[in-house]
């Protein structure tokens, strides 16, 4: 689970969207998850039943629900080795991502084999700002709050990035963040 060090969110959210980093993700360690479905039923789903793929699970579309509990099968390692790998991952995140700025994490899923941040950078969008929402100068796949950003500013900037990448590269950019609630 060392790959997850520094990923913002919860275990339930990580299961919901198959969170991952550094070449691994939740699908590689999940045995089963207890799910509360939209209809109010609660049931265990196995890893296979979760139908994981890149940053998605069955919970996002076919069987909407939330993860209440998760059983994970982790690899046994020496404590020092685990701590060292976690620190390495956190350090990498600090060096390459704007973790000191208010943001929601990675905005777009990587349109494999491309990398979302690289596409945004190559399109010349780093530093582009709408209202208080700004594409990070450090990493193109992050939108930071440059001061007073509203949800609408962020949504407008996301839409602008999607439109620009589609026009320049004919690639559809899908959000990794889940947008819920009112957009104020």
UniProtKB/Swiss-Prot annotation:
Its EC number is 1.3.1.98. It comes from Bacillus licheniformis. It catalyses: UDP-N-acetyl-alpha-D-muramate + NADP(+) = UDP-N-acetyl-3-O-(1-carboxyvinyl)-alpha-D-glucosamine + NADPH + H(+). One of its GO terms (cellular component) is cytosol. Its main location: cytoplasm. It is found in: Cytoplasm. Its cofactor is FAD. Transmembrane segments: none annotated. Pathway: Cell wall biogenesis; peptidoglycan biosynthesis. InterPro entries: FAD-bd_PCMH-like_sf, FAD-bd_PCMH_sub2, MurB, MurB_C, MurB_C_sf. The active site is at residues 55, 106, 176. The keyword Transmembrane does not apply. One of its GO terms (biological process) is peptidoglycan biosynthetic process. The keyword Cell cycle applies. This is UDP-N-acetylenolpyruvoylglucosamine reductase. Cell wall formation. It is an enzyme of class 1 (oxidoreductase). Keywords: Cell cycle, Cell division, Cell shape, Cell wall biogenesis/degradation, Cytoplasm, FAD, Flavoprotein, NADP, Oxidoreductase, Peptidoglycan synthesis. GO terms for molecular function: flavin adenine dinucleotide binding; UDP-N-acetylmuramate dehydrogenase activity. Belongs to the MurB family.
């Amino acid at each position: 689970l060392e790959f997850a060090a520094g990923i913002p969110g919860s275990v339930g959210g990580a299961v919901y969207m198959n969170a991952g980093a550094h070449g691994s993700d939740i699908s590689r360690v999940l045995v089963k998850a207890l799910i509360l479905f939209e209809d109010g039923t609660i049931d265990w789903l196995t890893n296979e039943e979760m139908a994981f793929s890149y940053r998605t699970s069955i919970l996002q579309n076919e069987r909407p629900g939330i993860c209440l509990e998760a059983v994970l099968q982790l690899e046994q390692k020496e404590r020092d080795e685990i701590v060292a790998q976690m620190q390495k991952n956190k350090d990498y995140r600090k060096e390459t991502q704007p973790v000191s700025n208010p943001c929601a994490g990675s905005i777009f899923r990587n349109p494999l084999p491309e990398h979302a941040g690289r596409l945004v950078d190559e399109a010349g969008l780093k530093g582009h700002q709408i209202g208080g929402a700004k594409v990070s100068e450090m990493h193109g796949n992050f939108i930071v709050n440059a001061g007073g950003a509203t949800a609408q500013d962020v949504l407008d900037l996301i839409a602008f990035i999607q439109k620009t990448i589609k026009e320049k590269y004919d690639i559809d950019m899908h959000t990794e963040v889940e947008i819920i609630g009112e957009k104020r």
